[in-house]
Amino acid sequence: MQRIAKKAGTLTLSLDLFDEVDLMMESSNEGRTWFIKESRLVHRHAEIGRSYEILVQASALAALIARNTVDEASRAAVADLLRIALAAFGTADRADIVYFKSLYRFVRAEGYPLKEQWFPTLPAADRTSAAELLNRPLSTQTALPAVVTRLRRRLEEYLRGHTEILID
């Protein structure tokens, strides 16, 4: 067995699932296939792995965004949203609330008028709960998980029936 020497001063960067990176890409066949030429780690969200529930919710949000084509005009807003959401997943105890708030913000960033169309369809008690979830900081949230789940499901049902956003 022969050891392959590395160039002096080069380090191999192992990228992780939720890492934010700067990439230099290159194509050898007129843009049909792209390869990573260089990568630079910007931020690692390692804390997301501290809990299975957090990992599941963060993965669901990332998959939702990946599944839906983001208009060029809203890409910066969605990138900021993802950055904020991943940081929140890393520090918050309530991943369900982070996901719900992030889903709502994503749909709003895509231009859908949730406040005007979805919100009024909720029963009064759910409107109050939704407003508290969306407007209060995570650290002050006290909503029961069942309430968050119910509101998330109602929002997802609305999105399936009234938008082009792919939930599943």
Show where each model-derived region lies.
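Non-catalytic alpha-helical scaffolds and adjoining flexible linkers that form interface surfaces
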Residues: 1-168
